[in-house]
């Protein structure tokens, strides 16, 4: 059994969470692409400070949400840079319309500049805790 480690309550955190809300154009095409292409491609990037990359889809397949978590703002920028240089950057826009972007955490100015082009909303870290295994 793994020992669970809990950070101090209300400790400063540099962790970033990026949430993309999307309207899916074709559910079956999107499901295949997100699982067999996008997730595999991003996994293969071996970005050591990317914590997670997870797609979620509504029951009717009409909406999807991508949630990505990172150690800090700099590692989020590595992911965004890799995304921009990848073939999946164009592919995703053939499959979904991005309807909203939410950036949670203490984003640095370069991240704010990059994500503002997508109309991102920014919320700085305020309070709480996290657990790790």
What are these regions (language model features)?
Residues 2-64, 71-82, 94-133:
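Short S/T/G/P-rich N-terminal loop/turn motif that feeds into the first structured element of a domain
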Residues 84-91:
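A short, acidic, amphipathic alpha-helical segment used as a generic capping/interface helix at domain edges
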């Amino acid at each position: 059994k793994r020992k669970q480690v809990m950070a101090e309550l209300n400790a400063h955190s540099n962790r970033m969470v990026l949430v993309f809300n999307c309207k899916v154009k074709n559910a079956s095409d999107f499901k295949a692409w997100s699982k067999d292409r996008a997730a595999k491609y991003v996994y293969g990037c071996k970005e050591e400070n990317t914590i997670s990359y997870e797609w979620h889809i509504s029951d009717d397949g009409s909406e999807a949400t991508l949630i990505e978590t990172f150690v800090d703002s700099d590692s989020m920028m590595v992911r965004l840079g890799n995304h921009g240089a990848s073939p999946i950057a164009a592919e995703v826009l053939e499959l979904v319309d991005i309807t909203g972007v939410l950036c949670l955490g203490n984003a640095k100015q370069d991240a704010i500049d990059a994500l503002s082009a997508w109309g991102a909303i920014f919320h700085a870290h305020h309070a709480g805790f996290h657990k790790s295994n």
